[in-house]
């Protein structure tokens, strides 16, 4: 007897659901796309428990004829294509007829629908792929579909779902992309009784960007437009000063469909050229319209990847369009905004706090400000960040000589020093900071004074005693030992010194946090807010306290004392970018990345000319480092040429036919 047999429809649908429905966000995507294809202008999404127990999508679209409803839950039944020619001319978001039967196979589904052509609608109930009931129903035109108990008959799938906040952020992210694409549709999203997203449906894409990413970010967007014989491009791109740590903030829409395509996103980055910092990516929304014959959507179960004909031509059009648009714009950052914009935001926050109470207990801090704590705080002095009260004074620096006493001061509340190196720049910023004074190793009389270093007093085994010689091009230092010559990258060297200092500071979980009298606000999208809420323990472990301030804004209440003054917002943005990009970061990994980031930010740069004393101090600190050989990113700090190797380079040692001979034996 043969062993091959045809699978039942129920089992086949459950298998298909494994490809189409990965998580609650997949259900929301399929149902909302059906509503869009039905011509809806208003779509409301309601979820509970991140969609695991309840999802409801309500639209005012065309509805489904009652006769067609049972067929709609049959595999490969669709109204969107009829023959193979339609498969190459797809203009709808859905076309396979897999979504509804896949959802019904693994959940309890109830659908109520009505069209304008029928006097009554239909209320249809199906669970686990089996029809429960079909009864007449009255109501307005459109469709209401409710999904309960997702994966109830495939419990193994539930084990692979992430935390509720993570799953909810994925749902919101999908709706964000659809809202950016279909700006003429009014979307609302609510979860567990709280509103997460609301768009007006007025067709203004920049207004949707403001609703998702914040008004400040939307104001830093540039409109773009370009076309050739095959493609038409419109949309918005961010100014080079507005970047993120991943490509996730770049939305590419092809004929209204959100897609992921490396060649297209890479073309956007190429359009910026050298205007972007390494490892940073622009924000933006790119609308690409083309003949459906030039794209193949039927290559991915979730239809998130497509094949593009004439991809090279499209990429070049994107590069040219973006490059030309940036060339038209004055890209010099607004100095007033840079110096005073954040303080204005802080003042606005302070004024607003009197009338606004955050309504998001899902990100409540452990030591929330109740009435008792507020009263207690009001009677105690609060440390205020110097950056909020002390103006930056730019003064001309005196010419430094190597025989003067150089005193460097940098204050830290933990009273541990961090090395600071004088440069020969024309000006330097003098700001009042929290602590430590130490003298250079060369005093006025030339005597060797005692230094206090933030590193171990023991030199690493094998690290030579270096005698500083000079500097080249403000980037490299020359030094020598008894038998070798060394070339040192000054930026990498100070990165290593700073890294070991910050690693120690960040690794200490203490009460040395800076509580802000006037909190700093940062705009995030709703999906980012949800993801950040999921990682509050990691943030709190570093001494960073964030609280919600509305649907798309976070307040920095406290931050570690090692934050650089004036860079608090940028630092917090980078730290939250790590969490959003990497997802699963342990506290130890988080601290490691923070130490690396701060070490790079505080390191001297190329083309900065060090005084002899400062260079010697840098080498002294490097010699005390636990690992003086590599910067935190793995790049080499120094390279060595032995005396023998140098003699070979200059032919002072040559190989004869019989033996090595030295020019020292034959003086010129």
UniProtKB/Swiss-Prot annotation:
Q: Which spans does this entry mark as compositional bias, Polar residues?
A: 438-459
- In this chain, the stretch annotated as Disordered covers 437-459
Listed GO biological process terms: mismatch repair
- Record Pfam families: DNA_mis_repair (PF01119), HATPase_c_3 (PF13589), MutL_C (PF08676)
What molecular functions are annotated in GO for this chain?
ATP binding; ATP hydrolysis activity; ATP-dependent DNA damage sensor activity; mismatched DNA binding
Cellular component aspect of the GO annotation: mismatch repair complex
Q: Which PANTHER family match?
A: DNA MISMATCH REPAIR PROTEIN MLH, PMS, MUTL, DNA MISMATCH REPAIR PROTEIN MLH1
**Which NCBIfam families does the record match to this protein?**
mutl, PRK00095.1-3
Protein name in UniProt: DNA mismatch repair protein MutL
Highest lineage ranks of the organism?
Bacteria, Bacillati, Bacillota, Bacilli, Lactobacillales
């Amino acid at each position: 007897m043969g062993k091959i047999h045809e699978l039942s429809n129920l089992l086949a649908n459950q298998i298909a659901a494994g490809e189409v429905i990965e998580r609650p966000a997949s259900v929301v995507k399929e149902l909302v796309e059906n509503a869009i294809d039905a011509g809806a202008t208003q779509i409301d999404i309601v979820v509970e428990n991140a969609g695991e127990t309840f999802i409801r999508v309500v639209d005012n679209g065309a509805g489904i004829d009652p006769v067609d409803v049972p067929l709609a839950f049959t595999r490969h039944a669709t109204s969107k294509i009829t023959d193979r020619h339609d498969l190459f001319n797809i203009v709808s978001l859905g076309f396979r007829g897999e979504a509804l039967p896949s959802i019904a196979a693994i959940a309890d589904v109830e659908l109520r629908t009505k069209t304008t052509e029928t006097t009554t609608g239909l209320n249809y109930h199906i669970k686990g792929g089996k029809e429960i009931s079909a009864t007449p129903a009255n109501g307005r035109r459109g469709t209401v579909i409710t999904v309960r108990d997702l994966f109830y008959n495939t419990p193994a799938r539930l084990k692979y779902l992430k935390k509720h906040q993570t799953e909810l952020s994925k749902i919101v992210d999908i709706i964000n992309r659809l809202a950016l694409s279909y700006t003429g549709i009014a979307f609302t999203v609510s979860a567990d009784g709280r509103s997460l997203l609301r768009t007006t449906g007025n067709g203004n894409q920049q207004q949707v960007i403001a609703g998702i990413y914040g008004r400040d970010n939307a104001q830093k967007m540039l409109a773009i437009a370009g076309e050739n014989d095959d493609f038409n491009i419109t949309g918005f791109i961010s100014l080079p000063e507005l970047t993120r740590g991943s490509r996730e903030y770049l939305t590419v829409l092809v004929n209204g469909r959100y897609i992921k395509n490396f060649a297209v996103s890479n073309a956007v980055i190429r359009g910026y050229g050298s205007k972007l910092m390494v490892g940073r990516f622009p924000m933006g929304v790119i609308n690409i319209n083309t003949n459906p014959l030039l794209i193949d959507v039927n290559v991915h179960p979730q239809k998130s990847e497509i094949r593009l004909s004439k991809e090279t031509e499209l990429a070049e059009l994107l590069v040219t369009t973006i490059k030309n648009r940036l060339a038209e714009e004055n890209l010099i950052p607004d100095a007033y905004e840079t110096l005073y914009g954040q303080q204005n935001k802080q003042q606005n926050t302070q004024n607003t706090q009197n009338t606004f109470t955050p309504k998001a207990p899902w990100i409540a801090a452990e030591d929330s400000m109740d009435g008792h704590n507020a009263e207690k705080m009001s009677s105690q002095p609060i440390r205020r960040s110097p950056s909020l009260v002390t103006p930056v004074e730019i003064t001309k620096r005196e010419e430094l000589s190597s025989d003067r006493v150089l005193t460097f001061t940098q204050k830290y509340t933990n009273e541990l020093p961090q090395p600071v190196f004088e440069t020969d720049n024309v000006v330097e910023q003098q700001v009042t900071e929290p602590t430590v004074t130490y003298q250079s190793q060369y005093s006025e009389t030339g005597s060797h004074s005692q230094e206090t270093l933030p590193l171990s007093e023991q030199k690493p085994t094998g690290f030579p005693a270096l005698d500083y010689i000079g500097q080249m091009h403000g980037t490299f230092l020359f030094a020598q030992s008894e038998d070798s010559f060394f070339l040192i990258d000054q930026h990498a060297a100070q990165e290593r010194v700073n890294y070991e200092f910050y690693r120690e500071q960040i690794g200490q979980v203490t009460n040395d946090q800076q509580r802000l009298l006037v909190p700093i606000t940062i705009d995030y999208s709703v999906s980012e807010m949800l993801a950040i809420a999921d990682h509050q323990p990691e943030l709190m472990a570093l001494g960073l306290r964030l609280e919600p301030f509305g649907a798309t804004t976070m307040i920095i209440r406290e931050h570690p004392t090692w934050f650089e003054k004036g860079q608090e917002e940028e630092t917090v943005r980078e730290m939250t970018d790590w969490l959003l990009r990497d997802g699963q970061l342990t506290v130890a990994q988080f601290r490691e990345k923070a130490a690396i980031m701060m070490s790079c930010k505080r390191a001297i740069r190329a083309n900065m000319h060090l005084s002899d004393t400062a260079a010697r101090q840098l080498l002294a600190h490097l010699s005390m480092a636990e690992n003086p050989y590599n910067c935190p990113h793995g790049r080499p700090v120094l390279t060595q040429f032995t005396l023998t190797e140098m003699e070979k380079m200059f032919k002072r040692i040559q190989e004869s036919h019989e033996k090595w001979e030295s020019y020292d034996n034959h003086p010129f």
